[in-house]
Every structure is written in C-alpha cells, then in structure tokens.
C-alpha cells in the first residue's frame, strides 16, 4: 500500500480502508492520515489476528487509543479491524475494542 498511497489519495474518495500489518509491513493510521488529509474518513486497521486473539484488554485499549491519536482530533475515523475476525477471536476481545472506542467517542 505504501508505494500507492499518494495515488490512492489523489483519487478523491470519501473514505479509505486499509489492511492490518502483514509480513512485517505495517501501514499506520498516521501515515494514511498524512496522505489523505484531515477531511476524509479513514477506517482503522487493528490487527484482528495477533491483537484480538491475545485478548489482553489493556493492550487492546492501548491500540485503540493509539489509532485514535494517530487519526487526529475531529478527523473522521471508523475504528475497525484490518481484516475479518477469525472464528476463534474471544468475544471479550471484541467487547474490549468496542468499549475502548466508546470511551474515546462518547
């Protein structure tokens, strides 16, 4: 995604979703926000495999906080995973993600 990020940003889409870290390559919310600017909606890329499968509430909360911080205050942002949830993700991990998001948005 990195080599194509500026091209993607130039297309003028209203929003952009991007994949979670894979094979040692991570695309941060901050990197995408810099390319797309403060007015377009970004869809976060929390790691649904490593992060949520570990089911560590504090780690999940910290990851949510970091994505929110990187997106920027008042910039449109949808907190979500960067790929589908595996079948074995604990529901408690999903709840931790939702509760963390609510604590920043409400």
PLM features per residue range, with description:
Residues 1-106:
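Active-site loop segments of alpha/beta catalytic cores
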